[in-house]
Regions:
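Conserved short alpha-helical segments that host acidic/polar catalytic motifs at enzyme active sites
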Residues: 1-141
């Protein structure tokens, strides 16, 4: 599909190629690509009051319908300058995010974050299909 050849034949490989195609080839932002892969339901789009947001999501769902990933997934995607975490739009796979100082922790459950940072200050569970985009400052690590 789109010139990619899946060698491993795993969902991880397919999702990686989808993001490469959307971001690198098509020029979408990470947030827009997330809105394709874990697209809001048509009823959710129809109920949006922000017309610009409504038109954007309608456009993306119409233009890239075959790139919607309908099964359960929770991914962390690295890119030059940071990372993005995303789970499926139904939240069939859990994902929790925590923050402490200038660090961000992402795991499938809060307990895993607390093992890494017992005094984590801000913990939340993003909604299904809500991307968490973390930009890393140059020279931090």
């Amino acid at each position: 599909m789109f010139g990619y050849k899946c060698n491993l034949q795993t969902d991880t490989e397919v999702i990686t190629y989808i993001f490469d195609y959307l971001v690198r080839v098509q020029g979408l932002t990470l947030g827009e690509a997330a809105s394709v892969v874990a697209a809001p339901f048509w009823s959710t789009i129809a109920n949006k009051t922000d017309m610009e947001d409504k038109e954007k999501h309608t456009y993306l769902r119409t233009l890239f319908p075959s790139l919607l990933v309908t099964g359960p997934f929770s991914i962390v995607l690295g890119y030059n300058g940071g990372l993005m975490a995303l789970n499926d739009r139904l939240k069939l796979r859990s994902m929790v995010v925590g923050e402490k100082d200038n660090k961000v922790y992402i795991a499938s459950e809060e307990a895993a974050i607390r093992v890494m940072e017992p005094n984590v200050e801000n913990i939340w569970a993003p909604a299904g299909g809500e991307p968490v985009i973390v930009n890393v400052k140059e020279g931090c690590f």
